[in-house]
Amino acid sequence: MSASDLTSVQAAAPQGSRQILVTSALPYANGQIHIGHLVEYIQTDIWVRTLRMHGHEVYYIGADDTHGTPIMLRAEKEGLTPKQLIDRVWTEHKRDFDSFGVSFDNFYTTDSEENRVLSENIYLALQEAGLIAEREIEQAYDPVKEMFLPDRFIKGECPKCHAKDQYGDSCEVCGSTYLPTELLNPYSVVSGATPVRKTSKHYFFRLSDPRCESFLREWVSGLAQPEATNKMREWLGDAGESKLADWDISRDAPYFGFEIPGAPGKYFYVWLDAPVGYYASFKNLCERNGIDFDAWIRPGSKAEQYHFIGKDILYFHTLFWPAMLEFSGHRTPTNVFAHGFLTVDGAKMSKSRGTFITAQSYIDTGLNPEWLRYYFAAKLNATMEDIDLNLDDFQARVNSDLVGKYVNIASRAAGFLIKRFDGRVQDSAMNHPLVAKLRDAIPQIAASYEAREYGRALRHTMELADEVNAYVDGAKPWDLAKDPANAVALHETCSVSLEAFRLLSLALKPVMPRVAVAVEAFFGIAPLAWADAAKPLSSAQPIKAYQHLMTRVDAKQIEALLAANRDSLQAEAAGAAAAGANAAKDAKSNAKASAKPAAVNGADDAPISIDDFAKIDLRIAKIVACQAVEGSDKLLQLTLDVGEEKTRNVFSGIKSAYQPEQLVGKLTVMVANLAPRKMKFGLSEGMVLAASATDEKAEPGLYILEPHSGAKPGMRVK
């Protein structure tokens, strides 16, 4: 660890006892938990366990997000009431979180009386503050179901490329975005009927109000992640600009949710009451355990409040949520921590490849949940970078790090200590230099966890495990045991090894809590906390017989996991086909013959040929210089090293997302064979690739592509 790294983790170390409220985003109650979800819950849980091990008062709160049109329609499709559906899904979600050791203090539901009261109170406070506006809007309406349709519940022909069965806001074939009114031959995915346009009164949170803008400009300065700060500033615009739009917080009946006070037939949009669900779940816990709820959520509270989320919902948690809290008389979040997305084997999760892996299928296949906790932790840091679950690397890393390095230490020493020394350690061995080194490292590892630098914490831990194994290899206890004259040396070697194993177990406890419980039972000690680094094993407490703590990952288990998830797709597709046939039959009298059943959720996009792809020359490029383009609000001028004799000049419309100095030295991907384009600012000799959401209005933001370390300028992407 470098001096700068050490300084940063020491700065993150806890100071005194703290009160801390932590949340993860609420899973939507219309589907299963999958491994993409688990990234966030495991990340949050590791952080929470780290804080608990310091002795802080920490509450980890969760709930199912249960309201909205999709819940209502799925329940109808399954012949259930919405309440029956969400109760069943809650049980499934709770089972999955328990399986993966996600230690919620309370896992609740947004469909609760606590949430209804809190949501109403927040709304009424915002109304009293003059931050609620009423407006007439025009929407698509299903004349058969007699309901207004969200954009994603309308399909039709893309107005740009004429692909069939595209959603009402974007085309999955050509990537175009458009208004639902621009769709050709539109139909309702609910009934198959042709939508009509109809006006309705809606309620808006006036996020554009100068008070909100002023507050958010100040609040953004406290965000821990530079990427989040940049996005916030992009959404806010420069001082004097008015880039914030008012937020539609209402939906029309029929709708599963909470009715708005004083507005019969109007309901809170799910994104209003969902974050309030954090407080509702906490209030439920407080009422059951005698905790002063108001002391935690009132302005000026000394308690801390943190939200772990995916970067795709940053907009809601860094704009709407803090503004709602500020102007309804509540404390605001201490910080929001966003993580990236999960890919599997370098690609988005795919049902057809079996990589859209559900939590339950992982458990049913017999894979150890702590393997996945460890692997995700090894990949996670404090940024919003995406992480990849490479299944070959998963097998290799778990087998090497956890079985080959960590567990191996105990298995090599415990038997000798039991047989030769009655299971009691040599007390003088607790002062061995190797033990002292591990003991001194524990605060650094704990601080890395608290700084959300889990990968760094585990690299440090495994480096120490390597040193312990080298010590055992050098001491050769199996040889020492052959001669009774070596009893003292053998006793010391085994004692040092097992105390080192205890300290490594302490370092790994936030990541692998169930292994830690087994280790605590093996040593006959109380649950490990960070302060226990200074409390070594004692000869007064003999160890128990060693039991195997972990097995290796078998490639056959991985194959079975992929096969199980491919099988689930086939079953789902068969069900969707049957449902589609029934829907077509029901819609025949209501809709045009062009109405189609919905496509299977998660199916892969239409493929292109290898010849099509080969026409594009994608190259790794290093940004050697970057500057803002005078006279342009959008462009940055990049000087790129593409492995050629000369650098290339490229203009890129990413100014809203990045400061020039952030990009210098980074690797990215460019289209190298794009025809040069003459612009008024100069010649652009290629195109830098960046990602953005399909609906950039709802989810603004740009993200340049960055290759893994090892890539070099000029390498071809293929």
Curated annotation (Swiss-Prot):
One Pfam family cited in the UniProt record for this chain: tRNA_bind
GO biological process, one term: methionyl-tRNA aminoacylation
Motif 'KMSKS' region mapped to chain: 348-352
Main location: cytoplasm
Gene Ontology molecular function: any one: tRNA binding
Residues where ATP binds: K351
Subcellular location: Cytoplasm
EC number assigned by the record: 6.1.1.10
Residue ranges of every copy of the tRNA-binding domain listed in the record: 612-718
PROSITE patterns: AA_TRNA_LIGASE_I, TRBD
InterPro entries listed in its UniProt record: aa-tRNA-synth_I_CS, Anticodon_Met, Met-tRNA-synth_bsu_C, Met-tRNA_ligase_1, Met-tRNA_synth, Methionyl/Leucyl_tRNA_Synth, MetRS_core, MetRS_Zn
Entry GO terms, CC: cytosol
Matches recorded under SUPFAM superfamilies: Anticodon-binding domain of a subclass of class I aminoacyl-tRNA synthetases, Methionyl-tRNA synthetase (MetRS), Zn-domain, Nucleic acid-binding proteins, Nucleotidylyl transferase
Cofactor note: Binds 1 zinc ion per subunit.
Short sequence motif named 'HIGH' region, residue ranges: 27-37
Domain of life assignment: Bacteria
Alphabetic keyword roster: Aminoacyl-tRNA synthetase, ATP-binding, Cytoplasm, Ligase, Metal-binding, Nucleotide-binding, Protein biosynthesis, RNA-binding, tRNA-binding, Zinc
Residues binding Zn(2+), per UniProt: C158, C161, C171, C174
HAMAP family: Met_tRNA_synth_type1
Description of how the protein assembles with itself and partners: Homodimer.
Family stated for the protein in its record: Belongs to the class-I aminoacyl-tRNA synthetase family. MetG type 1 subfamily.
Known role: Is required not only for elongation of protein synthesis but also for the initiation of all mRNA translation through initiator tRNA(fMet) aminoacylation.
Listed name of the protein: Methionine--tRNA ligase
Natural source organism: Burkholderia cenocepacia (strain HI2424)
